Amino acid sequence: MNYGLTHTPSLTTSECLVLGVFSDLALPDFATAIDNEQQGLIKKLCQRVPEPGNTVWQTDVEGHSLLIIQCGKKEEFSANSLQKRVGEITEALIKQRFSSATVCLPRLNQESAEWQLEQMIVQIDNLRYQLLDFKTKHAKSHKLESVIFHLPGATEKSLEMAKAIVTGVEFCRDLANMPANICTPTYLGEQAISLSKQFDQISCQVIGPEEIKEMGMGALLAVAQGSDQPPRLIDIHYHGNKNSAPVILVGKGITFDSGGLSIKPANAMDEMKYDMSGAASVLGVIKACALLKLPINLIGIIASAENLISGSAVKSGDIVTTMSGQTVEIINTDAEGRLVLADALTYAERYNPDFVIDIATLTGAIIVALGNIATGYMTRDEQLAKSIECAANESQDKVWRMPLDEAYQDALESPLADMINAGFDRSAGSITAACFLSRFTEKYRWAHLDIAGTAWISGKKRNATGRPVPLLIQLLRHVANSR
């Protein structure tokens, strides 16, 4: 996909010129000039869009097309309005099978041109994204391949930043959408190594089962033991500032989750290929950071395995010893994500991080609580919470803070081990899962993102969303600016 900027939009810049106008129908100077050349055509078309979101087409204007969209009152044109208008424009361009367009929308009053450009590109890229498919016969596809923006105040630097973000999001989506017979733990490791070969600032180590065992990662090994696919611990570094403490992102990389012996229902089990979306987001963020050349140190740690059923699979009631030395009674084999994360979070201690954020499709309970709008997050660190909230607001990648009170820890008591891996009832499931993880994070500042509701869209049109890559990139940009 090609994105660009122009200071002099015209009908001939691309196949279609898109013009956003406010309800007063006042035209910017360039549009007035075009209107004069076309004997008042634009003003006539504007009369046909009386309500916000209304559109009108005019084809065959000097061999090109013109789309007018009404943006409402100037004083009411907000970030939400922008998102709606960009969505309507993108869907219209795709429906009309345009391969290129020049988009001229009004500036937001309260936001920078850089921010507005990023939001428009992220929105367009999200809607034009096409699933990787394995069909032997393909219908003729027609993709929107080029969008040029006229946005006073936007710079080439801001354009390159926006392109880096959507590249990271696309990489995340491509990985998450890959079928589980291809995207195995080994494949994830290969993708991480590939990043280290693409960028000089990235290095990578992929650790196999023998060394995982030597390090005492009994929880990760327990989850993996039911599958013929060996587990992988991926340790990938972006070296942007050798003098600063690293930020660590820990990703859950369960490339397929049957639930183990606590087997999931058949309905929608195919979507459990998305259980590695946390890992995919970590790799997407690292790729974007390399493109952005952020002056930070960033480490991605991914614990990857398959959770399957076999004669060697872990059983309900088994007790395992984690890398931290703490023991866990496995009450529910379908609460496997927190097990692999426990060892990965302990592994993170060796790097003396500034802070750690884990990203995981961890619980169905978070979907019940928040649906697919906001990512649930938990932390005891108020400064980190403020940073996450700020990044979420700026990136429009929504979050909602859930409690992490000490009283919830009681649900994890075991008569046989230091803890159980899941509560005996379903109450407060997302919170007790985070409480479990908190027991492995006492040596650093930590936050947990439960992306089970936001990482993918379910159903017939199932598709990875690429969230929370925009949120995390914005957070890391703040870290970079503070150093």
Curated annotation (Swiss-Prot):
<feature type="binding site">
    <location>
        <position position="336"/>
    </location>
    <ligand>
        <name>Mn(2+) 2</name>
    </ligand>
</feature>
<keyword id="KW-0378">Hydrolase</keyword>
<dbReference type="InterPro" id="IPR008283">
    <property type="entry name" value="Peptidase_M17_N"/>
</dbReference>
<dbReference type="InterPro" id="IPR043472">
    <property type="entry name" value="Macro_dom-like"/>
</dbReference>
<keyword id="KW-0645">Protease</keyword>
<comment type="similarity">
    <text>Belongs to the peptidase M17 family.</text>
</comment>
<keyword id="KW-0963">Cytoplasm</keyword>
<feature type="binding site">
    <location>
        <position position="252"/>
    </location>
    <ligand>
        <name>Mn(2+) 2</name>
    </ligand>
</feature>
<feature type="binding site">
    <location>
        <position position="257"/>
    </location>
    <ligand>
        <name>Mn(2+) 1</name>
    </ligand>
</feature>
<keyword id="KW-0479">Metal-binding</keyword>
<feature type="binding site">
    <location>
        <position position="257"/>
    </location>
    <ligand>
        <name>Mn(2+) 2</name>
    </ligand>
</feature>
<dbReference type="InterPro" id="IPR000819">
    <property type="entry name" value="Peptidase_M17_C"/>
</dbReference>
<dbReference type="GO" id="GO:0005737">
    <property type="term" value="C:cytoplasm"/>
</dbReference>
<dbReference type="GO" id="GO:0006508">
    <property type="term" value="P:proteolysis"/>
</dbReference>
<feature type="binding site">
    <location>
        <position position="275"/>
    </location>
    <ligand>
        <name>Mn(2+) 2</name>
    </ligand>
</feature>
<dbReference type="InterPro" id="IPR023042">
    <property type="entry name" value="Peptidase_M17_leu_NH2_pept"/>
</dbReference>
<feature type="active site">
    <location>
        <position position="264"/>
    </location>
</feature>
<keyword id="KW-0464">Manganese</keyword>
<feature type="active site">
    <location>
        <position position="338"/>
    </location>
</feature>
<comment type="function">
    <text>Presumably involved in the processing and regular turnover of intracellular proteins. Catalyzes the removal of unsubstituted N-terminal amino acids from various peptides.</text>
</comment>
<dbReference type="Pfam" id="PF00883">
    <property type="entry name" value="Peptidase_M17"/>
</dbReference>
<dbReference type="GO" id="GO:0030145">
    <property type="term" value="F:manganese ion binding"/>
</dbReference>
<dbReference type="Pfam" id="PF02789">
    <property type="entry name" value="Peptidase_M17_N"/>
</dbReference>
<dbReference type="InterPro" id="IPR011356">
    <property type="entry name" value="Leucine_aapep/pepB"/>
</dbReference>
<dbReference type="GO" id="GO:0070006">
    <property type="term" value="F:metalloaminopeptidase activity"/>
</dbReference>
<keyword id="KW-0031">Aminopeptidase</keyword>
<feature type="binding site">
    <location>
        <position position="336"/>
    </location>
    <ligand>
        <name>Mn(2+) 1</name>
    </ligand>
</feature>
<feature type="binding site">
    <location>
        <position position="334"/>
    </location>
    <ligand>
        <name>Mn(2+) 1</name>
    </ligand>
</feature>
<protein>
    <recommendedName>
        <fullName>Probable cytosol aminopeptidase</fullName>
        <ecNumber>3.4.11.1</ecNumber>
        <ecNumber>3.4.11.10</ecNumber>
    </recommendedName>
</protein>
